[in-house]
Amino acid sequence: MTALASFTFVRHMDGLRYHFERDGEHHGRPAYRRADGNVWCVWSPTDGWHCEIADGLVTAHPLYSHADEPDPPATVWRSFKSDRSYLYDLRPLDPEA
């Protein structure tokens, strides 16, 4: 199976979109960098699939997944930073689009 090349997180409350592109590997699985370069979506043995910022602080996890799939799961994710929390859909991008 081929790893995702890119995907978008779409925020539930207002449709805000964050685009991620594949950029190397992390712990033997694909790593994805947000287009603005501030956030990574990666897999680790301890946290499974998650998003983290540059200092390694975990900022999001999938809600309805074991987080051990070969690619980030296309499901609802919850972000959390300081006192804010949002729900996002991870939507794989169609390479033909």
Question: What label would you give each PLM region?
Answer:
Residues 1-97:
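Interface elements of modular peptide-recognition networks comprising either
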